[in-house]
Regions:
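Intrinsically disordered, low-complexity linker/tail regions enriched in polar/charged residues
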Residues: 1-251
Length: 251
């Protein structure tokens, strides 16, 4: 039976970076430590494909019992189950600043997930309010679009694209709550995009629909023209939402 998922990259046993399976195998005699999954930190082992390429890949040593979103549908999204602390004045200012820069934030999200529309964006904001996302003291504006991508869970492919993949985003295993972002003693977290085939018999994809998992950059926020490609309908829809939210501020 074919083992899944098969990864080309793993966390380096010693250095703070990803390592390709071929590099890992080449340097194996010099390495002290195990390759680990960047999403769950579980131990990986190397297998060789039984096809013409005979290429090497990483698979989870625990097989189907791995507690990893790449392997099991039962693994919860850690960011979605941890509620933030009570809102402070800083938190309210962070939220107000987010609303003032909403176009830039939406454009940042669309650089990574082009199907993310205004309705999904406003839904993510409401979800963030429920989770008191703004209350985490280390949360920075530049990270908020990526947090919203992770909180959104499955992002459906556009209805007119039959071959398009569904998307899902996860931070690396070091980010178990939003408060883990932005800490002064930690390195930049990694964000991963999981692509899934469009399901035929179910509402959402499962691990059996997984196509691949790739790291995506978290640098788009500083390079965007905030008003580029936003339609008048986008602006009107968000302004209506913002007016409604102003009457019921986050608590």
């Amino acid at each position: 039976m074919k083992e899944r998922p098969m990864l080309e990259y793993a966390l380096h046993p010693v250095e703070d970076r990803l390592v390709h399976v071929d590099e890992f195998c080449r340097d194996l005699p010099l390495l002290r430590g195990l390759a680990r999954c960047p999403l769950c930190s579980g131990v990986l082992r190397v297998v060789q494909l039984r096809d013409r390429t005979h290429a090497r890949r990483f698979v989870h040593a625990a097989g189907p019992f791995a507690r990893c979103p790449l392997v099991s549908d039962a693994v919860p999204n850690p960011l979605a189950v941890n509620v933030g602390p009570p809102l402070t004045e800083r938190a309210r200012q962070l939220r107000a600043s987010f609303f003032a820069q909403w176009q830039r934030h939406l454009q940042t999200i669309r650089q990574t997930a082009s199907a993310f529309n205004v309705t999904r964006f406003t839904g993510a904001i409401e979800h963030a309010d429920v989770l008191k996302m703004w209350g985490w003291p280390t949360l920075a504006q530049r990270d908020i679009p990526y947090v919203m991508l992770v909180l959104t869970d499955f992002i459906a492919a556009p209805g007119n694209e039959k071959q398009a993949a569904w998307l899902r985003f996860r931070f690396d295993a070091s980010v178990q709550q939003i408060g883990d972002l932005g800490k002064p003693d930690r390195v930049m977290p990694r964000l991963f995009r999981l692509r899934y085939k469009r399901p035929r018999m179910s509402k959402y994809p499962s691990v059996r629909h997984l196509i691949d998992c790739q790291q995506v950059p978290m640098t788009a926020h500083d390079m965007l023209d905030a008003e580029a490609s936003l339609t008048g309908a986008d602006v009107s829809a968000f302004e209506s939402f913002a007016q409604k939210m102003a009457r019921t501020p986050a608590e």
